[in-house]
Amino acid sequence: MHKLLFSLLSVVSLSFLLFFHGAEARQREAPFPNACHFSQINSLAPAQATKFEAGQMEVWDHMSPELRCAGVTVARITLQPNSIFLPAFFSPPALAYVVQGEGVMGTIASGCPETFAEVEGSSGRGGGGDPGRRFEDMHQKLENFRRGDVFASLAGVSQWWYNRGDSDAVIVIVLDVTNRENQLDQVPRMFQLAGSRTQEEEQPLTWPSGNNAFSGFDPNIIAEAFKINIETAKQLQNQKDNRGNIIRANGPLHFVIPPPREWQQDGIANGIEETYCTAKIHENIDDPERSDHFSTRAGRISTLNSLNLPVLRLVRLNALRGYLYSGGMVLPQWTANAHTVLYVTGGQAKIQVVDDNGQSVFNEQVGQGQIIVIPQGFAVSKTAGETGFEWISFKTNDNAYINTLSGQTSYLRAVPVDVIKASYGVNEEEAKRIKFSQQETMLSMTPSSSS
């Protein structure tokens, strides 16, 4: 009796956990009314490029019908070698994907301790050891970044990026403007903590805005707050600086980056660091070994969600990385509980999207740098061109799931043959062929490529 009662309580508890997690994942502000009614979906390119001293920031038009439907906006940052994207934060949570390049990324979260310390004369990295040694620098945790990394960013958590490589670093950022953590409105905002407005003419979109947070304060207030003189306070305001938010560093920069997990052992227990402060905030999604679907002939797909990167529960977004070889195909499918923002990172593909009325709303060839929005429930297929196809998809749910129209795990495999016969007006042999012919689950080859 006790075992039965315990089992029932366990089932009820699990049901409540799943219900509340699902409800929490859906707590997004409603996008614009009727935003997802399309007669045609368009592929999107950047609407504006703001050039800085050592790079540029391109933004997509957040008022486009496609992005309004998804409730997101998109930016692309290009950093020249030895340049810094200066500290800034966004009003909504975001996911960033490193398209190319390598370097160092820092997050600045209020309440988190300075767990990285450099000590004068020390041969190692990090803090600890001899009390007679003098600290040269302390700062919050840093992360190395490289191609294929996905970074999660919470609302209001500042970040900076440094390109230490020999070529440009390119980072695509998707901001969830309808996330409940964004308490302002659905217009994207970037709050700069350093940097200044450039000399370029006024841009049509409202962001990136320009001056940093210090520039609006009375210099005397800044001087008192930091215990510095007025001249230094004016330096913080960047009053005579027009380099913008991406600047060139004066020589290679030095950082304290300890061995993995070392910084976690020296933290001060403050109740905050045990959540975001010590959370893993990035994962490389390009590694073939972590593929969820793999075909030696067609390609591979990797998924990053809150099950393998728990911080995504706070961001409420996830990512999917896909590669198709020449002639490879992603079987027709739909995302049941999220919109999809697909960014093309390489190659070409024919993409077709079908809406809730069974009408084709997109049927075009897409290439590098383009964005396509696939609304929740809309069916989509992808077929790679001769050079193959690469993409990164961002989905507006931290645990989004996909249903396929054909293949081993598709809805048709779960439907009895007699129901298929009645639904489509086919005989039993044709119904079985429809149900069982496709042996793949997600990735396949087109007939012309298979021959």
UniProtKB/Swiss-Prot annotation:
Post-translational modification remark: Ubiquitinated.
Organism lineage: Eukaryota, Viridiplantae, Streptophyta, Embryophyta, Tracheophyta
Tissue/organ expression: Accumulates in seeds 8 days after anthesis.
Any GO MF annotation of the entry: nutrient reservoir activity
Subunit structure: Hexamer; each subunit is composed of an acidic and a basic chain derived from a single precursor and linked by a disulfide bond.
PANTHER family named in the record: 12S SEED STORAGE PROTEIN CRD, OS03G0336100 PROTEIN-RELATED
Source species of the chain: Arabidopsis thaliana (Mouse-ear cress)
Recorded family membership: Belongs to the 11S seed storage protein (globulins) family.
SUPFAM superfamilies in alphabetical order: RmlC-like cupins
Modified residues (Phosphothreonine): 115, 396
GO cellular component terms listed in the entry, alphabetical order: protein storage vacuole
Name of the protein described by the UniProt record: 12S seed storage protein CRD
GO biological process: seed maturation
InterPro entries: 11S_seedstore_pln, Cupin_1, RmlC-like_jellyroll, RmlC_Cupin_sf, Seed_Storage-Functional
Function: Seed storage protein.
Residue numbers carrying Phosphoserine: 39, 302, 437
UniProt domain Cupin type-1: residue ranges: 42-234, 283-432
Localization of this protein: Protein storage vacuole
Classification via SMART domains: Cupin_1 (SM00835)
Alphabetized UniProt keyword annotations: Disulfide bond, Phosphoprotein, Seed storage protein, Signal, Storage protein, Ubl conjugation, Vacuole
Disulfide links within the chain: 36-69, 112-277
N-terminal signal peptide: 1-25
Keyword NAD: no
